[in-house]
Amino acid sequence: ATSKTDTSLKAIHMTPSVPGGTLREAERENYRFFLRLPEFDRTRLKVGTVKGSQFLLPLFEYSGACAGCGETPYVKLLSQMFGDRAVIANATGCSSIYGGNLPTTPWARNAAGQGPAWSNSLFEDAAEFGLGFRLSIDQQNEFAKGLLTQLTDVLSDHSTVGTTVGAILDADQSNEAGIIAQRERVSWLTDNLRRMNTPESLHLLSVVDALIKRSVWIIGGDGWAYDIGYGGLDH
């Protein structure tokens, strides 16, 4: 407070930064300009290096973690490298407080609407929780491949070079370029399934995204790692 006698002044006294809010509006426009900047081509970046990875778009931003938190830089890096296809099994603790402080969340999405899928387990069983994610995703992938194989003859009439059923089933998704190529093939498949509008095509349409490789991660805070649960024995 600037006065010990004026009781209207508190320890923190809020006043407008600039009358009329002109400064805030100018900064909002600067931020909108920043968001419109194009992203780097992920296939041309050396994401295996620290320098190269930092050119990737973070899909974890503005979290409510404590200042100096040692975990969030790693979570941000994870979101840069795998965020557009990440599935995260979170353990209750710090990572659930800064990661799911609803109605806000630091987990973001890119211009295509892709971003991490995040869920939290209350029971400190993140290992089992994450394993369940992995098993269910693998099962959905096999199920989608089986349905796709049944529709091979129908889809062959719509195939072009690089978008055949065989290319989808045998896709190499071991690197960024392969995953992007698979996304394009699955997009082609999705369009054709919608046009077909048969029970079989609609069934496959419900799980078609499982044909794109997912990256499953288990995240926990310090409480999960050291304090909570059965003395860490279940971890």
Task: Indicate residue ranges for each PLM-predicted region.
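Short secondary-structure boundary/capping segments
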Residues: 19-21, 30-33, 102-111, 232-235
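N-terminal leader/propeptide and maturation segments of large enzyme subunits in energy/redox metabolism
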Residues: 122-197
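Thiamine diphosphate
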Residues: 71-77, 84-87, 97-104, 196-235
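Generic, well-ordered alpha-helical scaffold segments in large soluble proteins
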Residues: 1-6, 72, 77, 81-85, ...
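Glycine- and acidic
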Residues: 54-65, 125-130, 167, 171, ...
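Gly-rich Lys/Arg/Thr-decorated short loops/hinges at beta-loop-alpha junctions or inter-strand turns
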Residues: 50-61, 183-189, 212
